[in-house]
């Protein structure tokens, strides 16, 4: 467990001591906080099971390469780059997260090879959430050498960016059917896409006071 710790995210509320870390290869989420006695505590709160695959000698790990916390500190989002799914958890109680949404796009499990008419190469990788918590943009390229190893077809197809509609009130996710950016069609492409940013601020770069 807790192997290849990748991204660290804190609550946006500066008075909160709660934070989260995603472990990529073991596909866990760790939660930490300071207790009433002022001592730091930690616990594992999410586990993603490995999945069998006929072409692999071992079950495929999810490879949770990124996590993100919504601006209101209500939801945690995570990806499973090799499995091909994005997940939304309600972390109103950070000790007991609840799965409230899941979508599939690409991945090695074959559950969503085509999204909005585009052949997917890769799986959900980096992602960014709008400040209002309603739009999650997800890209598919992790690192070119690893892309080529696990998704060799990405050399010819390029990457894509998908928009996921999120319900910040009740939870839930769905792929927006009217939005997709196919970087395989870029001039001098095929190109790949990694990280998205909002010019007016996003849930990674902002806090609230």
Language-model segments: residues:
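Loop/turn-rich, solvent-exposed surfaces of beta-rich toroidal or solenoidal domains
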Residues: 16-32, 57-153
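Sequence/structural signature of beta-propeller modules
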Residues: 167, 174-209
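Residue-level detector of high-confidence beta-strand sites
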Residues: 45, 102, 138, 178-180
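Short, small-residue-biased leader/transition segments that mark boundaries at the very start
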Residues: 2-3
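Long, K/E/R/D-enriched contiguous segments that form extended
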Residues: 6-48
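Conserved GH/AH loop at the N-terminal boundary of individual WD40 repeats
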Residues: 48-49, 106
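Short loop/turn segments immediately following beta-strands, especially the blade-tip
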Residues: 31-43, 88-100, 163-175
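Beta-propeller blade signature
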Residues: 152-168
């Amino acid at each position: 467990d807790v192997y290849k710790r990748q991204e660290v995210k804190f609550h946006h509320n500066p008075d909160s001591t709660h934070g989260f870390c995603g472990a990529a290869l073991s596909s866990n989420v760790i939660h930490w906080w300071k207790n009433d006695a002022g001592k730091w505590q930690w616990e594992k709160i999410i586990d993603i099971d490995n999945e069998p695959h006929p072409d692999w000698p071992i079950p495929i790990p999810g490879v949770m390469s990124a996590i993100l916390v919504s601006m209101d500190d209500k939801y945690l989002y995570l990806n499973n780059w090799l499995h091909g799914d994005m997940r939304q958890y309600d972390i109103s109680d950070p000790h007991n997260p609840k799965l409230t949404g899941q979508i599939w796009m690409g991945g090695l499990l074959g559950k969503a090879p085509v999204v909005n008419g585009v052949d997917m190469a890769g799986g959900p990788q980096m992602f960014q959430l709008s400040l209002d918590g309603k739009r999650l943009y997800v890209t598919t390229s992790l690192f070119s050498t690893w892309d080529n190893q696990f998704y060799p077809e990405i050399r010819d197809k390029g990457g894509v960016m998908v928009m996921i509609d999120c319900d910040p009130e009740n939870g839930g996710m769905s792929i927006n059917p009217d939005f997709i950016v196919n970087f395989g069609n870029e001039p001098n492409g095929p190109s790949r896409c990694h990280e998205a940013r909002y010019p007016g601020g996003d849930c990674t770069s902002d806090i609230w006071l």
